[in-house]
């Protein structure tokens, strides 16, 4: 990775346009003012500056992890047996994630059903032990005969917590204009969960922790942190939604601190949400619970990586636009990412991509974009090298695939075609 990264206005705006940089959006303020003002940040960092996100502490922080494999990395010479390694590693990673425990599948209710373009779309809801009820779309092709392979389709983050499942589904009803443009920008205009269902899958798209039906409501938090913002009215104007999303981006800092203080982590909580969704999917009468997979872009790619690494039920997984290394985040890219990524002490145990390999030899695919400014291209390639190395060492090199596509952060039609082919290879054989 280049050690002398350049921060400049063009680079920063490209981050912000992806909707990840949250607290660094120009003009973004929070109760009491935001000390991390984006405009000031840009003015203080010219195109010729050689800086990092934590100043004079950067060199020291970068040296802590170095290039050596983590203590539980399968790259270590001491690990040779895949089963023994992952049994030990999973116990430790579960401990670090500190996920809320949900002991049984909650009661699931069907609250709506539509048919659109050859796909049945049922709206489901269930109540977890924490937070508001979860809503999800369950999609199946019409005239199903026999049990189908099931895929957990994981929506992205996109700095848009007002929406979740609607980002990748079209249920045949009028779509909000923001969701139409979202699909056009990131998914070639496609509701890819629908496209996958058409190809013979049962697809579940759940709102995860803090998104759409699971979002934090302003009425439920103290006025001192509302920053004059109110919950979105039924008219759902773009202005109201964007205002809520700016507030929610800043609220991530509070949420992360509170979760750490409670003894859990943000990845641990969304993983618990998604594991329950996987249980719901596997319990449906239309689904073959022995053929389950997952796929997602960006924040959905992170979710795919986590549940694909931590849950043995996932037989095939695709991570799109969310693969790099911890080293990439230390100095240059942590500010472009959500708190959903970070687990204290995990980098000591293994590198970021190795989480995705925790269920080896289960097949895993990574899709990257060469102009994705959320990560350093060199570190995306290094993550690919790490995953190739561990799958090769385990004796299953054919069970891992990585592809690089031209262009910015996206999961476009060409990438969808490749992802769907990968899922078909492993879930329909």
Named regions from a protein language model:
Residues 131-133, 142-150, 157:
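Proline/glycine-enriched tight loop/beta-turn segments at coil->beta junctions
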